[in-house]
Amino acid sequence: MSPKKKAVVLLSGGLDSATTMAIAKAENYELYALTFQYGQRHAVELEAARRIAAALGAKEHLFISIDLRIIGGSALTGPFEVPKKQEGEETSAEIPVTYVPARNTIFLSYALAWAEVLQISEIFIGVNAVDYSGYPDCRPEYITAFEAMANLAIKAAVEGTMRVKIRTPLIDLSKADIIRKGMALSVDYGLTHSCYDPLPDGKPCGQCDSCHLRRKGFREAGFDDPAFSET
């Protein structure tokens, strides 16, 4: 019997990462979930990540703490206000203040290190270049560049015992398509959290970019969003 396939999966607790993890599970990977506590104001997503990992049967779930508040530069980790807008209001084409400097590079670097230790060649990340907020580290060319760097940077790749592959199953999907994919895989989106600036009780604000993208996706996919069923 051939050994079971294994994958490191970046799991934030949000809709995209939950769907990505469900896709990896459907492809019969043994799941090694990786979640970061980086000083984000929406720390409620950490508990969401814990619930998702348990529901999808992760073999291991590693939490890593990095205080990116020290660096600042983002509304998610600093004193800036998270932008709010009304339903139907256009999203700016500029990179928003919710961009966290080099976040995916930092996260993928930790994932790469853990994957090398575990001798796992595939890393799943739920980046999306269609319905997204303009983040530069969600683009296909960024992923291609990181993968090339990874295979120059680690001992296993240089020695030829492992070739790293960064898997991005959502990269070309709309938010509605992501939700349809997840529903087909029985993802419980009631476990997920997407809001950048949750209310004191942990419920979504309903006005940040992430809330708007999520609502729009569920509406276009033809499903009710459990995050807003009681808000």
UniProtKB/Swiss-Prot annotation:
GO terms for molecular function: ATP binding; ligase activity, forming carbon-nitrogen bonds; zinc ion binding. It is an enzyme of class 6 (ligase). Its EC number is 6.3.4.20. Binds 1 zinc ion per subunit. Its cofactor is Zn(2+). Gene3D superfamilies: HUPs. Transmembrane segments: none annotated. This is 7-cyano-7-deazaguanine synthase. It comes from Syntrophus aciditrophicus (strain SB). The lineage of its organism: Bacteria, Pseudomonadati, Thermodesulfobacteriota, Syntrophia, Syntrophales.
